[in-house]
Each structure stands twice: as structure tokens, then as C-alpha cells.
Amino acid sequence: MKTGHFRNKMLTLLTILGLGPVHAEPQQGLLDHDTRRLGSEETVNLKEAYGGKVVLVVNTASRCAYTGQYEGLEALYAKYQDRGLVVLGFPSNDFGGQEPGTEAQIKEFCRLTYSVKFPMFAKTQVKKGAADPFFTGLGETAGRYPKCNFHKYLIGRDGRLVDDYLSRTSPQSDEILNAVEALL
């Protein structure tokens, strides 16, 4: 096991137990960003809409090896939304042009192919150096930015980052399920 990975897992456990934050950087306002809903002109302040909930933020794409994770994300959302979990999807074309469609096309793909009901937002840049302010905050707080689609950031009810997960980590993995359960 990598030292950094072990350290992050131990800090996650301590945070869940209320013994300290995972990341020492200030996190006030991590969710305090306005963003536009996918395929709409409606703007949402994430803190106002989702503050007090457990939030799983995911950068998504329709033509990625991990696109099938939409199914697991929707299942996670359906299972836990009544207990206070929300999954927030942010399509991105940052990695190999794997999200080339318009927002209308992305919205239709998600609805028809995976019956996505969790909130989806405007196409977003997430890579370090070009990321929008929300993903810059997530990347800087976590100490890493997405390097591929379906990178996940888990935020607790207090608005603080609890952990982040590489793209290969399934939304149905024990790692994510246990962390979500502990926060709910």
C-alpha cells in the first residue's frame, strides 16, 4: 500500500469519527459556487441547493472506458438520496475528447442510456491549470485534480472534503459505499 494512500485513508477515518479534517486547508465555501444546470439557463448555487447533504462530485463523459459508471452512480443516488446523499455530475471534454457532444446531446444520452436522475451540470473544465473555480477548489483541497473522467470527490454534510477517488474506483466499491454510509 502506498504511504500517501494509507495516510489519506487514515485521515478519512479520523474525519468520519470526528477527530479531525482530512485536509488541513481552509474549506469554507467549497460548495459556494454558482453553476448552470445541464442543457438549461438555470443557475444553481451548490451550497444553497446541496449544503447539509453528503455530496459526491463526479466529472463525467459519454465516450470513456468508465462511462458505464453512470449506472453505479445512479444506483448509489437512488439508494441513498432519501438519507441525504446527492451525486452531482459535471460532463467534461478534457480527456481525449470523450465528451464531444452538445449539452442537449449529453443530457439525452444520460437519460436514455442510463436513466440518470441525479443532478447534472454544464460541461466543465476540470484539468489542473484550466479547471473552473469549483474544480480548482476541489483539486487544490484534495491535493489532486482529475486525470481522467469519473474522478470522484466526497464532501461531508459540513461542506468539507472527506476524500477523493480515482476514476477506476467504482461507485459501488466497498471503499465508497462504506464512506458514504459513515457520513449519512
Question: Could you tell me what each predicted segment is?
Answer:
Residues 133-136, 140-184:
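Thiol-/selenol-based redox modules, centered on thioredoxin-like
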Residues 32-34, 122, 156, 184:
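Terminal helix/beta-alpha structural elements that buttress the NAD(P)+-binding lobe
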Residues 55-58, 88, 153:
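Conserved hydrophobic packing residues within short motifs/helices of P-loop NTPase cores
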Residues 49-54:
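Proline/glycine-enriched tight loop/beta-turn segments at coil->beta junctions
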Residues 6, 10-33:
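N-proximal helix/coil linker or "cap" segments that precede and/or mark the start of modular domains
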Residues 66-131:
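Structural microenvironment flanking redox-active thiols in thiol-disulfide oxidoreductases
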Residues 59-63:
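Amphipathic alpha-helical repeat scaffolds
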Residues 23-48, 68:
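N-terminal "domain-start" segment that seeds a small globular fold
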